Structure formats: C-alpha cells, structure tokens
C-alpha cells in the first residue's frame, strides 16, 4: 500500500504595492534633454519686446527694424551698428527701385537688388537678420523679413504669408496682391516664371503654395512675420536640447505679438521644458518650472494641468525611489488641490501603503500602524483601510510562516478582529498555520497526532462560522487530515504484512489490534485483522 504525501500549505503575500505609471508629457518637437532650468526669469521677455508689443499696427519702419534685430537675438546695446547697416541697405534698395516705371516694377526691383547685393546663399537654419548682414546666409523667414523692411522703405504695402513649412511676402501693387517668394531672385509673382519653377524647390526644399491653395497658406501681418524669427530660433534651440532658452524666446514672441497664437506657442515651449526636465528625471526642476509658469500666466488651463501632471510625476518618482513619506506628502497635496482626481487619490493610498510596507519589511508592525495613524487625516478613510490591510497581510504572512502554532493563531485572530484582513483570508491563514504544523508532525511519522492538529484547525474554522464569520476555508485541512490517516493505515498494514509474510500471525494480530484501538472500524485494518485471525485458527 503506497503513502499519500501530505500537502504542506504555505501562506504567500497576496497584496503588493501598486506600481503607478508616469503621466507622459509629449514634446511638441525636439529631443528630451537640455540645460538646467534657470530662475523664474525664463518666463520674462527680453527688454524691448513688451514695449514693441504695445505699439499699434502698423509699426513705423525704425521700430519694425528694431523688432527684427531684437528677434534675431541682438541685445539692445548691440542694435545701433546693425540698424545703421540695415538702413543703408533699405536706402540703396529704394534708390535702385526708383528706376522702375510703376509700383509693380519697383517692388520687383527691390527683390532683385537684395539677391544681387545682400542675399548670398540659402541655408535652412539661417533665420536672423544679423546673420544676413554678417554672412549673407538666409532662409525663407529672414529673407522675407528683409524684403518686407526694404519694400516698406519705398512706401509699398506689404504683408507676410505662412504655410505649414514656409514663409514669404505679398505686396499690394497695381490694384492686386502679388506673391513674392523672397528666397529666389525670380520669386516676384512667380506663378508663371519658368526660371522660378526650375529653381525654387531645388533651392529651398519646399513646395510653392499658389494663391489658390488657401488651405495651406495664411496671411499674417508685419509683426507676425518678424515673430517667425523667434519661432524658428526656438525650434533650433529645442533641436539641440536648449529648452530653457527656447522658453525665453516663447516669452519674447508672446510679448511682441500678443494673441492666442503666440500664447499657445509660449505654452508649448513651457511644456517642452517641463517634459525635458522630467526626461532627465529632474522632477523637482520640472515641478518648479511648471508651477512658476502657471503662477506667471494665471488662467492658462494648459499650464494648470501641466503643473498638476508634473507634481503627480514627482510623487510617482519619489515612490519609485522608495521615499514613501515624501511621496505621500506630495500626493496628499495633489489630492487636496483636486479632491475629485482619482489618480491622485490612488497615489495617496499607494504611497501610504508603501510607507507601511517599509516598516513591515523590518518587522515593525506597530511602527507601520503608527505611521498610518499619523497621516490618517490627510489620507482619508479609504487609503487608511488599504494601508492597514497591507500591514495586516504582512504580519499575517510572517506569523503563519514563522511563529509557533499558538502564537500564529493568536496573531491571525487579532488581525481579523482589527478588520485588517477578510474572513476568507483569515480562513486561508488558519488552514496554512494548522496545515504547516500538521505536516511538520506528520513528517516525523506520527500520522494521527498530525491529523489531530488538522482536526483542530477544522474545528477552529467551525467556531469562526458559528461566530458569524464566513471563514469556512477551501477544505484543504479536511483533505490533509484524510491523507494523514491514510498514511497511518498504510503504516499499520505494512507492519501487519511483515508479520504475516514471516508466519508470525500472533504478531500480525497484535499489530492490528493496536492500530484499530487508534482507528476503530477502519475497513482496511479490519480486513487485515480477519486475515490474521483466520491464519491463527488454521
């Protein structure tokens, strides 16, 4: 007859701390790295932009020149020599235009003059006016701004046009609006010019948008055209990871060109700065930048949301680093500011549970409960209940797997009475505690003593049911007791067989009589006893 191996029950941890995901901040453009965030001044425009932004349209030509040079990155004290050079170009372009018979010819001659004498070579990132003056390198934005200034100098109405990837000018001459693709010497009224069509795309890499293609072109004023210098410079800075500097340009743009578009551009730059700081795991810097921006631009909903997201991610980072108290404090501030925010509430509960676990891992369950109690007012009832269940679970597992039987049962009873575990979990613990002890005794061969321990566990669960607690267990203790008794019967049968097979029928009968005294009525032992007695009677 074979033995049935008893199943040793082991109580495992069922509940662990939740892993909270970061709320990702999407970069509008550019890689996620850069220089450290400066002081709050990154939200302030450079001197001169606010003053120019307050000037009504149209600006006079000197102010427009000043705006273009400031947007190009020159400091106020650097402007005079560049403005003098710019004035000279405007005067010379005007002199060349005087030879034209009408406004159309004059406007075209200005473009011809600039390409012959100033604009040397196209380069995509050559977006500043001082860059043109110093090197002759230009792109669509800088050449359009220079043309705008020069044609304004001869009194012709001019405006800007922007598309998704390009900028140019229009002039009002001869009673009609004429496109001027300033990157190309043949760019005046370019639609029918073969020379323009052959060279434009090859030179710039962009597609010309004809006047009828209004879905991808938008008229902008002179001020907005100058603002594109700032926009381009910011994009270049972000591509090299210099997000704080790009954010300063966003402030300049918003000051120079007040309105929804420039404000959206500024907020995008702030978003990218915060996202880049988070990508470098500088969560303190990200929170500081987002909060400073939200305070400096009150009423901007995107910035309020950005500040909340940055603070949430800071709390998540603290929890991931195991700084549970700091994580809880940060999460509690968030939850207090946004009581209906489920993510913040979950983070409060998770960080409090994590703090409790940090005590529990050291076996300091009293300290864990004390830490929970100290923070109960800020955490709220749900978070407290969750954290206490974590502590109860940890203590229960430790007791079930490490304490003697009586102490382990007492701990389980207390944890259940404190409401830190459910009746079903209590039943699992009782089964594990009694099952482990029964298996330990059974391993020494005392099968019936082991079965008696299992029976005590079954009785314990029965008392729990009678007391109104639904903790009936899964029947594993009953199965274990049955296995242990089967092993007792197997042992007794094998002893009987040894006596019987050696012809010692008296010894066989004595062994069975003793076994039946412990398990009266067992059918296997009863049959064996009958066989021994039959052999003795022959």
What are these regions (language model features)?
Residues 19-29:
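Bacterial N-terminal signal peptides
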Residues 34-374, 385-397, 401-410, 417-439, ...:
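A structural boundary/capping signal
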Residues 458-461:
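Long, intrinsically disordered low-complexity tandem-repeat regions enriched in serine/threonine/proline
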Residues 7-21:
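Bacterial N-terminal signal peptides that target proteins for export
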Residues 2-5, 469:
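Ala/Thr-enriched low-complexity intrinsically disordered regions
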């Amino acid at each position: 007859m074979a033995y049935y191996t008893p199943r040793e029950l082991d109580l495992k941890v069922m509940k662990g701390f939740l892993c909270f995901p970061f709320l990702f901040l999407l970069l509008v453009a550019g890689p996620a790295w850069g220089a450290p965030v400066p002081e709050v001044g990154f939200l302030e425009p450079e001197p001169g932009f606010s003053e120019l932004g307050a000037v009504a349209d149209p600006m006079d030509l000197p102010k427009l020149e000043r705006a273009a040079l400031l947007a190009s990155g020159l400091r106020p004290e650097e402007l005079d020599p560049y403005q003098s050079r710019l004035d000279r170009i405007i005067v010379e372009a005007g002199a060349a235009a005087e030879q034209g018979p009408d406004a159309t010819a004059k406007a075209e001659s200005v473009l011809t003059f600039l390409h012959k004498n100033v604009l040397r070579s196209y380069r995509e990132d050559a977006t500043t006016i001082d860059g043109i003056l110093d090197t002759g390198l230009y792109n669509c934005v800088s050449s359009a701004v220079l043309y705008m200034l020069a044609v304004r100098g001869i009194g012709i109405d001019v405006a800007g046009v922007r598309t998704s990837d390009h900028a140019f000018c229009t002039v009002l001459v001869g009673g009609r609006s004429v496109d001027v693709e300033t990157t190309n010497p043949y760019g005046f009224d370019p639609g029918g010019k073969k020379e323009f069509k052959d060279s434009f795309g090859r030179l710039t890499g962009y597609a010309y948008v004809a006047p009828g293609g209004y879905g991808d072109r938008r008229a902008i004023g002179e001020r907005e055209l100058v603002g594109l210098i700032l926009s381009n410079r910011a994009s270049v800075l972000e591509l090299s990871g210099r997000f704080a500097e790009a954010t300063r340009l966003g402030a300049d743009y918003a000051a120079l060109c007040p309105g929804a578009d420039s404000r959206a551009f500024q907020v995008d730059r702030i978003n990218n700065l915060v996202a880049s700081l988070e990508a470098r795991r500088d969560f303190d810097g990200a929170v500081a930048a987002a909060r400073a921006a939200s305070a400096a631009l009150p009423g901007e909903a995107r910035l309020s949301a950005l500040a909340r997201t940055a603070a949430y991610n800071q709390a998540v980072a603290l929890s991931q680093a195991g700084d549970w108290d700091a994580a809880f404090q940060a999460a509690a501030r968030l939850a207090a500011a946004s009581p209906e925010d489920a993510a913040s509430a979950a983070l409060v509960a998770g960080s409090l549970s994590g703090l409790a676990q940090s005590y529990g891992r050291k076996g300091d369950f009293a300290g864990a409960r004390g830490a929970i109690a100290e923070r109960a007012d800020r955490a709220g009832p749900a978070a407290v209940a969750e954290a206490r269940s974590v502590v109860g679970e940890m203590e229960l597992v430790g007791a079930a797997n490490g304490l003697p039987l009586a102490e382990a049962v007492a701990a389980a009873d207390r944890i259940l009475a404190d409401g830190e575990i459910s009746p079903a979990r209590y039943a699992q613990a009782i089964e594990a505690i009694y099952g482990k002890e029964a298996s330990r005794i059974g391993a020494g061969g005392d099968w019936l003593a082991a079965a008696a321990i299992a029976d005590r566990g079954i009785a314990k669960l029965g008392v729990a049911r009678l007391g109104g607690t639904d903790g009936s267990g899964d029947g594993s203790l009953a199965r274990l007791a049955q296995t242990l008794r089967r092993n007792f019967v197997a042992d007794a049968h094998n002893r009987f067989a040894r006596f019987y097979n050696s012809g010692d029928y008296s010894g066989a009968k004595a062994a069975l009589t003793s076994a039946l005294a412990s398990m009266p009525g067992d059918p296997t032992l009863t049959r064996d006893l009958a066989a021994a007695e039959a052999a003795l009677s022959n």
